């Protein structure tokens, strides 16, 4: 059989009753094998204990102690079908566990192969899994080192500790497995269109892969019994890996198990085919989910909390009043916003702690608090927020290095710690923490001009320290002793978390100049491109410490992947953006978009229907050995995505930014949700890694975006604050906007506008009603206020 489009071809051949299935792509003008599977592609694993029998009308099989080979499906027949102009190739298989029909059709428009598998079991509980297992045609190489591996690119949401591990639907943030060798790219994406909570409870979708050396890599998609390691705990060795289980998948009597998936097969730039996967997931799933979830920022603890302004009241008054402590220190009026974490990780510390670290960054929280105080004219708030800045400026400095955590002692004294013991080493200065704190010190120059000279001095000392300590290849060691020596072997020669230092150096140069600082930032950026990107070794503290500890030399030989965490990616995406803004070098924008796209693989493209009480669309997970949803790093990347949109006009960036912003509020009061992928195991870490983190992003983004955002440079419009834009048109001097607001949201909304021609005048219509005529200059400067009476409702169910 053969199916063919302009860029994709599907072939089946039969030799002595054995099926060979091949998917080919047009590559360099020639047809090249992308997937080639010998034997029937569908495979089933028997459940160890089966019930039923002839009394239920099923064929009795007796003892199901069958080997995998004995459970294989034999080819029964192949057929071509044509209906309404669409050709479908069908293959029929039969085996002791049941019968299967596979349907393949090619989509010329999307350049995708759609596959549907229907399996009728011989008995209702005789399988532990049913899946299609497809082999990547290019042969793998031998693993050599961190630069050269079996394939040019491999990606899955989770990696393995044991061969039986897989990727369950609980980890489907971006449900895809991808391979690339040279320009040959292949990916499998499960079809989630029918995957509601009822379907997933009965038929647990899963993905799997294997990448053996000097052989053929494979990926699979189907129904797989399994889940979180039952021995896994946050502190345990099993966190978070997902083994297959022996539990049978129960099918209704004479029932049929159905699952579908898409294959993305194409010629792509080397190591960049993943970007097709990223965009496909959003186009196919994420965009639709965003349009259907107008109130994702509504929190189940209080349904009235939906407007970002309502959240601001909760955060900046109630929560900050609870968590703020003022204290005198070194002749300054200082303050802290407690995270209540340090007493758990550093013996002798109190719960009155101030964190200046990559997660609980009090300086960032206080910055957003001060922004709120300034825009509302509340001077008391602004002064209290400035107390957090004063504490950092008063911290003990050592050749430019400074500590990350303070503890307010019970006698009123202050004790500083260079790092915590949860994800660092208490007595050593940590580069990533200092870089992130330094970046936020620089932001405070905009709000606190009277302290700007002191801020600049502290930041210059830190910048000089980084320049001095930088390795020849651009990497900056992670940890330094009190004598400012990089003695710790871990992360000394290689790490990706130095991206935070690159961000700080680029921002310092952008504000204050200094060729040495630009050169150092670019040197670190080049290191990330040359040494990290080839095999995506995004090594940072979370990948090996924190709640998923593992040896620093851990390598997953089953999938040929390294541990990686997205915090280093988030800092890198931001750093490359600032480098471009500071120097105008298009290369940094190009590489920054590449890294930004890669981070999007850890963003949820759907509201998982089995996650209870919380919307998950837009939320970020952390790494490939953890499982949380809606972790607050999504608040960091939301601002960066908005900035990339404003530079590029890529609508996906803005939609993802809005989804990420909303997800931070859905997670309240936790630092993330469903920590191990499944429901439960949630933690509260305080305002600095929680609702405050989200509200700071809102304070940064809403002055740009308003409740609705229109960009006339790109002729695009977006709903932001519990609003959905249904359509937008720019016709000569008229702007037509169709929008709806969530139930419970105010009707008087602000539209922010960018890119209007300042010499033009525009007539604005909202839901068919004229809103007035405005000059382009007026729209750019202050936008306009409109009334949106139309109400939109959620189109998705969130389980209680």
What is each residue range found by the language model?
Residues 138-151, 754-770:
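Solvent-exposed beta-hairpin/edge-strand motifs
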Residues 32, 769-774:
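Surface-exposed loop/edge segments in extracytoplasmic proteins
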Residues 6-36, 41-52, 469-473, 580, ...:
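Short beta-strand segments and strand-loop junctions that repeat across beta-rich extracellular domains
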Residues 129-138, 742-760:
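Surface-exposed beta-strand/loop patches in extracellular or lumenal glycoproteins
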Residues 30-264:
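Beta-strand/loop-rich accessory regions of lumenal/periplasmic or secreted enzymes
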Residues 5-7, 95-99, 769:
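Glycine-centered tight beta-turn/hairpin loop motif at sheet-sheet or coil-to-beta transitions
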Residues 114, 163-171, 177, 185, ...:
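Glycan-recognition and catalytic cores of secretory/periplasmic carbohydrate-active enzymes
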Residues 693, 774-800:
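C-terminal beta-strand-rich structural cap/linker in extracellular carbohydrate-active enzymes
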């Amino acid at each position: 059989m053969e199916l063919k489009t302009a860029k994709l071809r599907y072939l089946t051949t039969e030799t002595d009753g054995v099926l060979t299935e091949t998917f080919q792509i047009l590559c360099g003008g020639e047809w090249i094998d992308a997937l080639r599977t010998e034997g029937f592609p569908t495979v089933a694993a028997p459940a160890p204990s089966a019930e039923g029998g002839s009394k239920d009308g099923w064929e009795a099989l007796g003892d199901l102690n069958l080997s995998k080979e004995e459970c294989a499906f034999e080819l029964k027949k192949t057929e071509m079908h044509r209906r309404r102009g669409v050709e479908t190739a069908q293959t029929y298989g039969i085996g002791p566990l049941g019968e299967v029909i596979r349907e393949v059709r090619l989509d010329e428009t999307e350049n995708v192969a759609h596959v549907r598998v229907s399996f009728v079991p011989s008995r209702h509980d005789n399988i532990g899994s049913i899946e299609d297992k497809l082999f990547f045609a290019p042969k793998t190489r031998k693993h050599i080192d961190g630069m050269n591996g079996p394939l040019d690119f491999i990606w899955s949401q989770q990696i393995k500790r044991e061969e039986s591990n897989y990727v369950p639907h609980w980890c489907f943030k971006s449900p895809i497995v991808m391979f690339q060798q040279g320009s040959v790219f292949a990916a499998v994406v499960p079809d989630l269109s029918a995957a509601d909570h009822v379907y997933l409870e009965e038929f647990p979708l899963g993905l799997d892969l294997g990448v053996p050396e000097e052989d053929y890599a494979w990926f699979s998609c189907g129904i797989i019994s399994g889940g979180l390691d039952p021995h896994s705990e946050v502190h345990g060795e099993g966190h978070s890996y997902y083994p297959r289980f022996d539990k049978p998948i129960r099918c209704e009597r004479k029932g049929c198990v159905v699952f579908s998936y898409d294959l993305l097969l194409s010629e792509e730039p080397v190591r960049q085919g993943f970007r097709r996967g990223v965009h496909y997931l959003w186009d196919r799933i994420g965009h639709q989910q965003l349009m259907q979830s107008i109130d994702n920022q509504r929190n189940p603890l209080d349904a009235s909390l939906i407007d970002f302004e309502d959240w601001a009241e909760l955060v900046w008054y109630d929560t900050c009043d609870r968590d703020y402590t003022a204290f005198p220190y070194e002749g300054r009026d200082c303050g802290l916003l407690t995270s209540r974490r340090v007493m758990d990780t550093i013996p002798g510390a109190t719960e009155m702690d101030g964190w200046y670290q990559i997660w609980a960054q009090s300086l960032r929280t206080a910055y957003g608090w001060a922004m709120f105080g300034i825009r509302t004219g509340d001077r008391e708030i602004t002064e209290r927020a400035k107390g957090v800045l004063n504490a950092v400026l008063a911290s003990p400095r050592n050749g430019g290095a400074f500590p990350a955590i303070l503890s307010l002692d019970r006698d009123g004294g202050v004790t500083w710690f260079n790092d915590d013991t949860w994800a660092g080493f208490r007595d050593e200065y940590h580069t990533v923490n200092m870089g992130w704190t330094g970046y936020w010190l620089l932001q405070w120059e905009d709000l606190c001009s009277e302290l700007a000279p002191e801020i600049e001095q502290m930041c210059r000392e830190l910048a000089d320290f980084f320049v001095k300590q930088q390795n020849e290849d651009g990497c900056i060691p992670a940890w330094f002793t009190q004598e400012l020596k990089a003695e710790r072997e871990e992360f000394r020669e290689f790490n990706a978390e130095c991206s935070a230092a690159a961000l700080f150096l680029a921002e310092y140069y952008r504000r204050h100049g200094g060729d040495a600082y630009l050169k150092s930032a670019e040197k670190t950026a080049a290191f990330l491109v040359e040494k990290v990107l080839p095999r995506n070794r995004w090594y940072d503290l979370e990948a090996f410490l924190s709640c998923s500890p593992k040896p620093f030399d851990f390598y997953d030989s089953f999938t040929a992947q390294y541990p990686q965490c997205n915090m280093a990616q988030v800092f890198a995406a931001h750093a490359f953006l600032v480098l471009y803004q500071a120097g105008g070098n298009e290369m940094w924008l190009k590489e920054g978009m590449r890294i930004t796209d890669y981070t999007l693989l850890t963003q949820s493209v759907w509201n998982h229907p089995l996650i209870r009480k919380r919307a998950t669309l837009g939320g970020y997970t952390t790494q490939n050995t953890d499982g949380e949803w809606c972790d607050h790093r999504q608040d960091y990347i939301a601002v960066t995505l908005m900035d990339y949109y404003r530079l590029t006009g890529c609508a996906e960036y803005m939609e993802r930014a809005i989804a990420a912003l909303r997800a931070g509020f859905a997670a309240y009061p936790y630092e993330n949700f469903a920590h191990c992928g499944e429901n439960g195991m949630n933690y509260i870490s305080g305002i600095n890694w929680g609702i405050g983190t989200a509200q700071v992003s809102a304070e940064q983004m809403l002055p740009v975006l308003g409740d609705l955002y229109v960009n006339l440079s790109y002729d695009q419009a977006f709903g932001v604050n519990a609003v959905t834009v249904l359509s937008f048109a720019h016709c000569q001097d008229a702007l037509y906007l169709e929008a709806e607001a969530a139930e419970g949201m105010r009707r008087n909304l602000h539209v922010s506008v960018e890119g209007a021609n300042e010499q033009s005048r525009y007539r604005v219509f909202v839901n068919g009603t004229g809103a007035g005529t405005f000059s382009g200059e007026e729209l750019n400067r202050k936008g306009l206020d409109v009334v949106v009476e139309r109400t939109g409702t959620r189109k998705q169910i969130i389980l209680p």
